[in-house]
Amino acid sequence: MAEAITIARPYAEAVFKLARESGSLFSWSETLDAVNSIVRESQIRELISNPLISSVKLREIIFSVCGKKLNEDGKRLVSLLIDNQRLLVMPQIHELFEQLKAQHESILEAEVVSAFPLDSGQLEKLVSILEAKFQRKVKAEVSVDSELIGGVRIKIGDQVVDSSVHGKLEAMATALKS
C-alpha cells in the first residue's frame, strides 16, 4: 500500500497542478472518479494484470468503457499510466488528488493569541499577510493572553509563529542555558 501511494504521488500532484492552473479541479475530479470506478472492477483489474493484453487493446477497452466521461487530457493520463504500467495505482492517484483538492479549497484556521486586543484594522492586516504567505484563505480565531507581554503567537496547522516578547525571552533563556 505504501509503495502504491509513493508511485501515485507524482501523478496525483501533476494532475492537481494541471487542474488548478487550468481552473478545472471539478472536471478532473469527475474524470479521475470515472477512471477509478472502472479500474476498481475485478474484470478490468484482471485485464490490466494480464501480460497477454497489449497496451493498445487495454487503452481501447478503457476508452470505450469510459465513453464521454474521458476528455483528451484524461485520455492522455490513462495512456501514460498504461504505458508506464501504473494503471493499477489509479485508486491511490484519485485519493491523493482529492486530498490535494480538499486542502486547496479549504480555509486555513489560524489561532492568533495576542498580548493585547487587536482592532479590526490590525486583524485584517494580519490575516492578509497570512493569506499571502500561505496562498489560501485564512480564518483567524483571536484570543488575548497578557502573559505574552507583547506581540502575537500564531498557530496554523502544525506551524507556530511566535513573535511574542514572552516567546523571545524563552528562546534567549534556552540559548543561554545551552
UniProtKB/Swiss-Prot annotation:
UniProt entry keywords in alphabetical sequence: ATP synthesis, Cell inner membrane, Cell membrane, CF(1), Hydrogen ion transport, Ion transport, Membrane, Transport
Pfam families attached to this UniProt entry: OSCP
Location in or out of the cell: Cell inner membrane
CC per GO annotation: plasma membrane; proton-transporting ATP synthase complex
Domain of life: Bacteria
Membrane association type: Peripheral membrane protein
Single GO term (MF): proton-transporting ATP synthase activity, rotational mechanism
Keyword Transcription regulation applies: no
Family listed: Belongs to the ATPase delta chain family.
Subunit (UniProt): F-type ATPases have 2 components, F(1) - the catalytic core - and F(0) - the membrane proton channel. F(1) has five subunits: alpha(3), beta(3), gamma(1), delta(1), epsilon(1). F(0) has three main subunits: a(1), b(2) and c(10-14). The alpha and beta chains form an alternating ring which encloses part of the gamma chain. F(1) is attached to F(0) by a central stalk formed by the gamma and epsilon chains, while a peripheral stalk is formed by the delta and b chains.
Function description: F(1)F(0) ATP synthase produces ATP from ADP in the presence of a proton or sodium gradient. F-type ATPases consist of two structural domains, F(1) containing the extramembraneous catalytic core and F(0) containing the membrane proton channel, linked together by a central stalk and a peripheral stalk. During catalysis, ATP synthesis in the catalytic domain of F(1) is coupled via a rotary mechanism of the central stalk subunits to proton translocation. This protein is part of the stalk that links CF(0) to CF(1). It either transmits conformational changes from CF(0) to CF(1) or is implicated in proton conduction.
Protein name, per record: ATP synthase subunit delta
Species per Swiss-Prot/TrEMBL record: Nitrosomonas europaea (strain ATCC 19718 / CIP 103999 / KCTC 2705 / NBRC 14298)
